[in-house]
Amino acid sequence: MASISHSSLALGGASSASASDYLRSSSNGVNGVPLKTLGRAVFTTIRRKDLAVTSRLKKGKKFEHPWPANPDPNVKGGVLSYLAEFKPLGDTQKPVTLDFEKPLVELEKKIVDVRKMANETGLDFTEQIITLENKYRQALKDLYTHLTPIQRVNIARHPNRPTFLDHIHNITDKFMELHGDRAGYDDPAIVTGIGTIDGKRYMFIGHQKGRNTKENIMRNFGMPTPHGYRKALRMMYYADHHGFPIVTFIDTPGAYADLKSEELGQGEAIANNLRTMFGLKVPILSIVIGEGGSGGALAIGCANKMLMLENAVFYVASPEACAAILWKTSKAAPEAAEKLRITSKELVKLNVADGIIPEPLGGAHADPSWTSQQIKIAINENMNEFGKMSGEELLKHRMAKYRKIGVFIEGEPIEPSRKINMKKREAVFSDSRKLQGEVDKLKEQILKAKETSTEAEPSSEVLNEMIEKLKSEIDDEYTEAAIAVGLEERLTAMREEFSKASSEEHLMHPVLIEKIEKLKEEFNTRLTDAPNYESLKSKLNMLRDFSRAKAASEATSLKKEINKRFQEAVDRPEIREKVEAIKAEVASSGASSFDELPDALKEKVLKTKGEVEAEMAGVLKSMGLELDAVKQNQKDTAEQIYAANENLQEKLEKLNQEITSKIEEVVRTPEIKSMVELLKVETAKASKTPGVTEAYQKIEALEQQIKQKIAEALNTSGLQEKQDELEKELAAARELAAEESDGSVKEDDDDDEDSSESGKSEMVNPSFA
């Protein structure tokens, strides 16, 4: 035990000290004695035996803060690697569904219910369920690869989106949070600290939002005050002094804009940060992990490179604020978000951002660990690039990044990247409502299979309903395809022109028909480039199958009905008696074939046959059906006539050649030639001014004049007489063929007229007709 004796001080010359000297603070003296007096005093040591101070000294344990050089991996609780009050929440966060995600979430629940139902019933619907799951994944992929700007804003603001410290916890080996701006305040909205990634030490600075209401209040919803920016500035100086690369994480709606912050110098703090960051000689990398609002984000965002997560946004004013200013209502936020160009893809095009870090489908909150690893990869890659630069090169690199933003050359024409179809294609993706209908249909099939164990054939009403629904979906697919290939406006204009031309006042003109055919051909050619081509193709195939099934079902039903009606007609007493009498006479005659029957019996058989056929024809007419067999027989008869009489065929071909040569001769005359040229000019004018009635009327008048001139020339050339003679020969040959055919059904007067006209149309050149 060691003893230390108390020593006293004897003061000399104290009488010269003033009273005010003894009233000074202890910081200016020792034991109440002013330093000024101590400087003039004479010291003597007096030992007092009646007073002693004792203390017990022992060797203390030396601590290594914050981490030992060689930590024991088997220590209880594991090696501490994270020094901060923040702790991960794990899976305790309540799931939040955004408005545009609700249809897919409900669909996913239904697919789960269908799988559960199939397992309970023991029925095998594996293929259908797998198909639905694949379609669901494709719909999810289409949704998140074609998000609108306002949808990306909503994802960036998602309550469960991982925060700055969540990513730090996932990517750093060790991290120690540093507090305070050394001016009496520690803003929790900005978190700073030193951490290591793969053995390399970095200074991390970032905005920190809350993960629940309590944390949001503590973190002020990620909106920093001047104290927060001054804390970040202090850490930047610290990193620059020690040579630590700086990594900043941006996730704030903006700097806190209350009256107190303005009094404390919010603008000055942000401006000071901007000025200082341009002079730091260490690498600076900024990553936008959520939303970056105006100067509040830029105060820690002046970096050599700025990267953005796929669904992050960066703006000078929020879409709601912009809409309130320009459109006087926040409901125009979707349009404002599109006009502001605040998404990662747009900002990379504008050279504001330098790269995009991918996110999983569903956003960063769907898989925070995977997102953090992508951030870690991006940090390592960019820091390896910056590590090859000196301090001066880093300053030049940082300056060049911001100098190239917004650069354009006035007066110099720039070729567009796309010279054809400059209209931007609209995103087309799978409709979750259609997929939901398929899920409901499968669910009904499972329930039906559970009750009947066999899937019944759908009724005609169900089939018609499915076909109509499929036609409606195909119309929607065609509309989406037209929008995607950039033909929507032309199709709309063509529809209007067609509706005018098809009305009573307007006639359909060949010019319009030709334009329609050209547009149709162009649409069919470009249809394969549409994003929804495969979906449209599958639905067309499905419609074809349904139509065939419907036709087969109707044919079967019609066949049954016809057989039933025929049987009823044959079973009538008068018909049955005649048929039975004929059968008895034929049996008593002993003839083995029709040719061996007597002539009187033949006539009787043919007469009875005609009566039965007439009765059956009446049955068909009563059902609203017509007989095509007669017309087919007429066609076959004409072919037989041409085959039997080669001379008649030669005459017909020769007459056609004469008519063609005469028409060509007439067209080459100066009068007709000038009329044809005028017709071409009027047709060209009409194609440039669609919908003009006068142009079409003028074209029709010219066509009628040309046709009349050609008809007059043909009538005066003697070709009409040749045609009349040839028609007489054809009629005689037709009568002869009709007499030779046994048991043929005779045609009525109307059919004779039709066949005559048909013969003319087959015989005479179409241009002459």
Swiss-Prot record:
Comp. bias regions, Basic and acidic residues: 721-732
Top EC class for this record: transferase
GO molecular function terms listed in the Swiss-Prot or TrEMBL record: acetyl-CoA carboxylase activity; ATP binding; carboxyl- or carbamoyltransferase activity
Principal localisation: plastid
Tissue: Accumulates in fatty acids synthesizing tissues such as embryos, expanding leaves, flower buds, flowers, and developing siliques.
Record gene name: CAC3
Organism: Arabidopsis thaliana (Mouse-ear cress)
NCBIfam families to which the protein is assigned, alphabetical: accA (TIGR00513), AccA_sub (NF041504), PRK05724.1 (NF004344)
Protein name listed in UniProt: Acetyl-coenzyme A carboxylase carboxyl transferase subunit alpha, chloroplastic
